[in-house]
């Protein structure tokens, strides 16, 4: 048997560290190493002062995260989904935004790293689901009919054996039909064949009538058989396929093939 090994490498030259002593150089190399690990096996990153500033900001956000979730600073912003054929509202997607009292609106690429660092993905999911269902209920009472709301669920949440029970409890609490809540799952999560809990949860949610959307389609390795296996209702083509679709004939061909 042949085993192939790889490693992630963080590099710091002594002249780039805040101070040229061993402790600072090693700490700076560790920051670069953490970023290399996030890029996957075999990645290499060289330290820069910008990395330290970002690491310090991440540390600050991580310390403030729990209070932000409890105080309602992190809430969903609702992005409309419009039917291209009719121009009518097809639903909303709930996008998490942190309305920080000092830094202003913080977008997911930054604070989701803090979420991962602190292991609070589940708590974030609970907050976004609660506010999304609450909004649906309020819109109904105001006479504003919204077909559905899509909520993103992380791989950590989808591994929770009690996830289906928790979501069902929330929709019953707000008296929202299951068909009006869409579960959005990243393609990379669906590709994790070895995780039976994830596949069981997604199938169970589909059986309860929840919509299943596959997000960022085209960035992973999801086969057509997986789309059937997970009872996917819709795929959301990754933006990399359509960014220059008006100029790139190959993108037009690939996107057309996916849609058909």
Give the location of each predicted region.
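Catalytic core regions of nucleotide second-messenger enzymes
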Residues: 1-7, 37, 104, 140-147, ...
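Catalytic strand-loop-helix junctions within cyclic-nucleotide turnover domains
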Residues: 2, 7-25, 50-53, 81-86, ...
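Cyclic nucleotide signaling catalytic output domains
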Residues: 8-17, 24-39, 45-60, 64, ...
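Catalytic core of bacterial c-di-GMP phosphodiesterases, primarily the EAL and HD-GYP domains
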Residues: 13, 17, 44, 84, ...
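Active-site core of bacterial EAL-family cyclic-dinucleotide phosphodiesterase domains
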Residues: 13, 57-115, 147, 152, ...
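Signal-transducing alpha-helical linker
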Residues: 21, 53-60, 64, 70-73, ...
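Structural preference for long, well-ordered alpha-helical segments in enzyme cores
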Residues: 25-33, 61, 94, 114-115, ...
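C-terminal EAL-domain catalytic cores of bacterial cyclic di-GMP phosphodiesterases
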Residues: 124, 130, 174-183, 194-215, ...
């Amino acid at each position: 048997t042949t085993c192939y090994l790889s490693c992630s490498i963080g590099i710091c030259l002594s002249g780039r560290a805040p101070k040229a002593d061993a402790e600072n150089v090693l700490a700076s190399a560790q920051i670069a190493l953490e970023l290399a690990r996030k890029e996957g096996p075999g990645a290499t990153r060289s330290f820069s002062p910008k990395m330290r500033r970002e690491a310090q900001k991440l540390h600050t956000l991580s310390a403030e995260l729990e209070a932000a979730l409890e105080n309602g600073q992190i809430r969903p912003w609702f992005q409309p989904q419009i039917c291209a054929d009719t121009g009518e509202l097809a639903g909303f997607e709930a996008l998490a935004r942190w309305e920080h009292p000092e830094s202003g609106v913080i977008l997911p690429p930054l604070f989701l790293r803090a979420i991962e660092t602190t292991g609070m993905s589940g708590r974030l999911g609970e907050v976004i689901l609660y506010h999304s269902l609450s909004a649906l209920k309020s819109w109904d009472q105001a006479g504003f009919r919204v077909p559905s709301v899509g909520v993103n669920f992380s791989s950590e949440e989808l591994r929770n054996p009690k996830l289906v029970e928790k979501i069902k409890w929330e929709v019953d609490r707000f008296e929202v039909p299951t068909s009006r809540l869409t579960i959005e799952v990243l393609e990379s999560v669906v590709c994790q064949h070895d995780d039976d809990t994830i596949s069981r949860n997604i199938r169970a949610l589909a059986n309860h009538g929840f919509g299943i959307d596959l997000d960022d389609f085209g960035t992973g390795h999801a086969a057509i058989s997986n789309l059937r296996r997970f009872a996917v209702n819709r795929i959301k083509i990754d933006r990399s396929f359509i960014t220059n679709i008006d100029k790139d004939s190959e993108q037009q061909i690939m996107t057309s093939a996916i849609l058909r």
